[in-house]
Each structure stands twice: as structure tokens, then as C-alpha cells.
Amino acid sequence: MKNVLLIGAGRFGRHIAMQLSQLGHQVMAVDTNEERINDVLPFVTNAQIGDSTNAEFLRSLGIGNFDVCFVTISGSFQNSLETTSLLKELGAKCVVSRAERDVQEKFLLRNGADNVVYPEKQMAKWAAIRFTADHIFDYIEIDEQHAIFEVQVPEAWIGKSVGELNVRRKFGITILGIKRAGKTDVAVTPDTILSDDTTILALGEYKALQKCFRI
């Protein structure tokens, strides 16, 4: 269980709070808007109405006691930037800030953010890949070059074993697991036989995955 500070209780911040709550973490939420604070109360341990660009207010929260600080302020990049910088000055262990544009990501990293999330860009990329290829069921970006795809078993692979296909040698792709009837099996061996009711969880470089699965 981690102690988390969430600054910005808008839609994205509220979803973060919900997920953190489900994972069993202790969450303190901060926002300038009382209505947004009330909306997030069911998912947090504590909440305060306050201005995160005020150093004294942030200091009163005991920033050094939090394992992670999320900055999910919407509508004011200036406030997000100032808050990010102040958090690091006050000894924050890890600051994760939200960006809405590429240039914002660069400024946030320069001003103290340890990591930057860009939900609109990440969702756009996921949707573009997911819904333009009928045989792609899910997609997780690892970094700019690597991803995990959940993909339908190609027709030519049906009835063959993982070892027989040897996609690691041919494409540099690792089969992490397979899914059948909604159940995931990560105990994949070279003897695992692929069937037409199976999807594959494959890890590799984008170019290799695109070539292998004709994405």
C-alpha cells in the first residue's frame, strides 16, 4: 500500500482516484473546487480544498510523506507547471504530471516531473490501432518502440506449436501468453499448440509486430 497525493480532481483525476482506491492505496485529494472534491470523496482517504501553487499550503500537507504525487490539473497548464516544480522543491519522491500537448510534456519534465502521462495522445494511438485492424483485440504501449498486442492467431499458425513457429528468432517477438474463452495462460512453452479460438499476447518492436501480424 502506498501513500498518494492527487492534485486535481477533475474527470481524469477522479478516474485515477478510483483506480488507486481499488488497488488499496491511501489517497489524499486536493482541488480548488469544492464540488470536485465532493465528487472524489468516496474514493479517497482524505481531501482538502486548496491552491496547489501556494508553497505554504503544499508544505502543510507533508509532501515528503507521499510515495507518489499525481498532478492532474486540467484547464491551467501554468498551475500544473508551478505545482510540479513546487512539489520537487518540497522534497516529493515521485511526481507524475498530466500533459495535454507535446510541448507541455517537455516543460513538465524540465520542471521536476519524474514522469508525464498524456492520456489523450495515448488513447488516440490505442484507438487508431485497435479499430483499424479486425484481428487486434488490445494493445499496450511499453515505450516508443515496443508494445504488447493481443492478436488473433493467424490462420497459417493454427495447429502449430510455439516452438515450431519460432517467432522469437524470425521476428524478435516474444509470446507472453495466450487467451482462450476469456482466460489467460502465461505458462506458454515451445510445445503449446495454437488453435483458432486463441488470441496471442505478443511483445516486440512495433515494426516487427506489424510485419509479423500484418497490422
Predicted regions and their residues:
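Cytosolic regulatory regions of ion transport systems
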Residues: 1-215
